[in-house]
Amino acid sequence: MAEGGFGADSVGRGGEKASVTRGGRWDLGSSDDESSTSTTSTDMDDLPEERKPLTGKSVKTSYIYDVPTVPTSKPWHLMHDNSLYATPRFPPRPLIRHPSEKGSIFASRLSATDDDSGDYAPMDRFAFQSPRVCGRPPLPPPNHPPPATRPADASMGDVGWADLQGLKRTPKGFLKTSTKGGSLKARGRDVGDRLRDGGFAFSPRGVKSAIGQNIKSWLGIGESSATAVPVTTQLMVPVHLIRTPVTVDYRNVYLLYLEGVMGVGKSTLVNAVCGILPQERVTSFPEPMVYWTRAFTDCYKEISHLMKSGKAGDPLTSAKIYSCQNKFSLPFRTNATAILRMMQPWNVGGGSGRGTHWCVFDRHLLSPAVVFPLMHLKHGRLSFDHFFQLLSIFRATEGDVVAILTLSSAESLRRVRARGRKNDGTVEQNYIRELAWAYHAVYCSWIMLQYITVEQMVQLCVQTTNIPEICFRSVRLAHKEETLKNLHEQSMLPMITGVLDPVRHHPVVIELCFCFFTELRKLQFIVADADKFHDDVCGLWTEIYRQILSNPAIKPRAINWPALESQSKAVNHLEETCRV
């Protein structure tokens, strides 16, 4: 065979050739009567002690694997032989540490696990229940004495299994019943239990009230027939909103957003429109008050406090207002994202001819992202940095119709006082006037965008051009110079120009202004004077309806109507369920 093959010359008799050319690790041709110098002996008796098997009979083999025949460590069930792992107590109770002990409860649980005794501790160490049916003991008798480690005040501790007998389910949660007075025997037993538990337990509501409550409970004097246990209300989680809709039915829908100062009648008009129009052709989105007041923090209460005690030029006040305005804007941004997912962006004003549908919103993202920050900026409560960060989150959709409702400041203040909201006490007439000015400034800026381009608006903000020069270069605007000057003075551009003067050379500022005016131009504004329609909601809606249908620039959008109705029902159900 050729060189490098497996011929007769390549491997000699008895492995001599292999031992000369290459010292193989496994010498399969070696024998007892041959003296080979290439491999190690495979006899089990000649192995060192550390390479012999740990147990079992030694067997001669040609291969040696360095793998022990028994495990090198103890099995899990031998390391953890505590009976707690076998049958946990049911039901679990919280672990109560002595005040003198240091360290966390988790550390105490770990130290308790190392105990080798098979007896249970007075309390369960792990808050889990046995999966076996037989692991649940029967209920204790009614007169069963409570454990010695029970909290002194039942309202301050967790509800155990023995305490569930005295609970009943109500619409407000679980209520723990307690009889007024009671028999002498029952009162004596309760006194003994509390003395055995260590006397009085002071609650964090104050020493004086705690002493009174503990004395009454020690004497067995009942104050009320039921003590409320706070339980979180179980609400439906609307995960169906993010799934692919089963029914797809695109309709022509007008997206109408009602805007204006507080007390102008936005919520009243939303409810009236849902009653005036046919139910199958209208849906609505209320003001997200539940998210503002109950999700994590109450930003509505916080902003009311800042209007009362906030200081102009204070960085802390500006940071708090920025945080509140961000939370105000989040529900509008999520709604806009959901609606954009249901929309056919290429279909404007066409599609199905089954009639026009309406979707009415209480406020637009324009309010928390532009109008209110502009008012706070004017009064110095919001810094320049925070103002432009809020301005950057503003987004709009082609076809959004913003109806600004106007009303006198005196009438608006009277309505605010009449509705009696808890956090509206800081609203004054001057505050309503400043807010109306902010709406008017944004509206004038939008009107300017109907005459000049977005690039020219940005150039006005960074002071690279002016109104006379723009009108001089355009034949169409030759006779509009005075109109544009008046609009420019009443718009938000003078304030933005003053803020951007030190940083107008920065590309970020240029791009920010360009994006903002591009989004603002997508909107369609109409103005309705609510002063002409006192106590006439139908007349006010007729005026808005007429302006929308007579404006050729306002067109409906093709939206999946079943998905939009499902989104609206989920939002309305949450507002009706959680609002007090």
UniProtKB/Swiss-Prot annotation:
It catalyses: thymidine + ATP = dTMP + ADP + H(+). Pfam families: Herpes_TK, Herpes_TK_C. One of its GO terms (cellular component) is viral tegument. ATP binds at G260, V261, M262, G263, V264, G265, K266, S267, R415. Its EC number is 2.7.1.21. Residues 1-60, 133-157 are annotated as: Disordered. GO terms for biological process: DNA biosynthetic process; TMP biosynthetic process. It comes from the Viruses. The keyword Nucleotide-binding applies. Keywords: ATP-binding, DNA synthesis, Early protein, Kinase, Nucleotide-binding, Transferase. InterPro entries: Herpes_TK (IPR001889), Herpes_TK_C (IPR013672), P-loop_NTPase (IPR027417). One of its GO terms (molecular function) is thymidine kinase activity. The active site is at E287. Residues 137-149 have a biased composition (Pro residues). HAMAP family: HSV_KITH. Catalyzes the transfer of the gamma-phospho group of ATP to thymidine to generate dTMP in the salvage pathway of pyrimidine synthesis. The dTMP serves as a substrate for DNA polymerase during viral DNA replication. Allows the virus to be reactivated and to grow in non-proliferative cells lacking a high concentration of phosphorylated nucleic acid precursors. Belongs to the herpesviridae thymidine kinase family. Homodimer. This is Thymidine kinase.
